[in-house]
């Protein structure tokens, strides 16, 4: 399945997540290192190790990865910790697509500062409402230019 599409399809996160079970059934590579603990004090290092494991396994294929780790970190620790991990990943990106599905309550409870930082770490942001997908556009605006126009 992975070779036909050209993408190395993978995921990482807790095995308790029902979506991970579905991805496993679809033969997506599970890059999670066991034991998995989103509350670990060395979570930054752990996430780096997971990304290295995935990159090594993918070889030269572009990666299509669903990362549930950052969602778990935002939920169990803080959104700011998840943003810090995303920022670190962005310093040394792998080729391909990385999907980071967050829970809306985790975003809304974090505050606008952390939410904006999270959005700045992503190329695109989507919100799912029922069966509809909305794309958010976030741009930094100059207050002076807005007033002058």
Where is each model-derived feature located?
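Non-catalytic regulatory/interaction regions at protein termini and inter-domain linkers
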Residues: 1-149
């Amino acid at each position: 399945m992975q070779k036909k599409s050209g993408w190395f399809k993978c995921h990482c996160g807790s095995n308790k997540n029902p979506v991970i079970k579905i991805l496993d059934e679809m033969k997506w590579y599970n890059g999670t290192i066991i034991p998995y603990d989103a509350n670990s004090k060395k979570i930054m290092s752990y996430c780096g190790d997971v990304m290295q494991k995935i990159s090594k396994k993918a070889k030269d294929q572009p990666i299509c990865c669903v990362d549930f780790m950052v969602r778990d970190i935002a939920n169990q620790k803080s959104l700011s910790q998840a943003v810090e991990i995303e920022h670190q990943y962005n310093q040394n990106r792998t080729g391909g697509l990385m999907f980071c599905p967050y829970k809306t309550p985790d975003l809304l409870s974090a505050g606008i500062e952390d939410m904006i930082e999270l959005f700045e770490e992503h190329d695109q942001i989507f919100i799912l409402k029922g069966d509809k997908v909305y794309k958010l556009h976030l741009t930094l605006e100059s207050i002076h230019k807005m007033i002058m126009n």
